Amino acid sequence: MKLGLVAGMLAVCFSFSSVAMTLKLTPEIDLLVVDGKNMSGSLLKGADSLELNSGMHQILFKVIKTLPTDPLVLYSSPPLIVVFNAHNTRSVAIKLPVINTLRDGHQFSKNPLYQLIGDNGHPLSVRHDVLRQDHLNNSTTLETVMAAYNVGKYNASVPAFAAIPPSPVSAVPGTTIPVAGVNTPHKTASLQGENVTEQMLQYWFLQANPETQKRFLIWAKKQPIH
């Protein structure tokens, strides 16, 4: 029921035409922006696909995966941009390389090779890029970042998506946007939780600045334990 509702709502957001293509999602894919519109994590939580109309699409996503190392490490890739045409394609899946070690993660961050596979099993023709520090400028949300990117002459720019009105809420206030860059260190965190939820909480806590961590701890102490 929930997944069907999510698919229906998103289909209405992106097009008034009939739904013609399914973007398959895996747990490692963190979908951030689609066709210039922010994707809410709570809206997509638990969904294994996203319904889109046929035609040109641009997605911004990250690869986030708990590596089976000792201790466990949560790998997070730089934000990746890919543009593809879904014409005459019923489904599209993002095919990632094997990322099981820190070395795999570093290699993917440095040279993110992946494919978009159509329902016929063949790779689609795509344009891709990495969202880097110089793309950010003074932008504060992912939607404004992508709007600025799309008016530029970059590998995966789509000018048509630069004019889409921003969502009412396109980013969590106080959240920083990790990006790739020459002077940006690769971030990993050693995690010791017993489940993925606990590991994710640890990871995002470590990503926050000291003031945000303090506010979170104050808030957490006030919450009842269920």
From Swiss-Prot:
Which InterPro entries has this protein been placed in? UPF0319
Read off the Pfam families from this record: DUF2057
As given in the record, the signal peptide range reads 1-20
> Which sequence ranges are marked TM in the entry?
none
For this UniProt record, the keywords arranged alphabetically read as follows: Signal
Q: Which domain of life is it from?
A: Bacteria
Q: Which family does it belong to?
A: Belongs to the UPF0319 family.
HAMAP family per the UniProt record, alphabetical: UPF0319 (MF_00789)
Write down what this protein is called.
UPF0319 protein YpAngola_A3206
